[in-house]
């Protein structure tokens, strides 16, 4: 089963450059002109939502075995934590180097900080590890930010 894609087209961009309009035209996504017309329970992709949440409740790095991660994270949802998935990041730690997504707690926290615009904090965090600067250089090259 595929996830249905919807776009809220507010007409604020140049229509010739609007990727949402192109997706709708190609029938790869369904376009909606107003939020009230969207079906309930959709996930709005809001790059600022997690930043506010992080400033209020902080970031929680979960230090658990990858062998027990599924059950561990299922239990955490019961405690009112807001789960978020990081985009694919490549670890450089000695244990799981190169195994996409298998981050250490420190890499996950640094990745989240960098995504939320706290690059200096992420760099400081990764400075505690010999391999830390390589993680930042690989996943968050300065020219890309």
Where are these regions (language model features)?
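N-terminal, charge-rich interaction modules
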Residues: 1-56, 66-68, 76-86
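C-terminal folded domains that constitute the principal catalytic or ligand-binding module
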Residues: 75-145
């Amino acid at each position: 089963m595929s996830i249905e894609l919807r776009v809220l087209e507010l007409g604020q961009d140049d229509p010739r450059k609007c990727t949402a309009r192109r997706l709708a035209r190609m029938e790869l996504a369904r376009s909606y002109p107003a939020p009230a017309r969207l079906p309930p329970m959709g996930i709005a992709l809001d790059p600022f939502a997690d930043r506010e949440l992080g400033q209020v409740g902080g970031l929680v790095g979960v230090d658990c075995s990858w062998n027990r991660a599924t059950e561990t994270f299922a239990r955490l949802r019961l405690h009112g934590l807001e789960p978020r998935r990081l985009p694919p990041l490549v670890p450089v730690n000695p244990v799981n180097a190169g195994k996409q997504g298998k981050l250490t707690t420190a890499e996950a926290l640094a990745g989240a900080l960098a995504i939320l615009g706290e690059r200096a904090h992420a760099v400081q965090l990764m400075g505690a590890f010999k391999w830390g600067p390589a993680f930042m250089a690989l996943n968050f090259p300065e020219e890309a930010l």
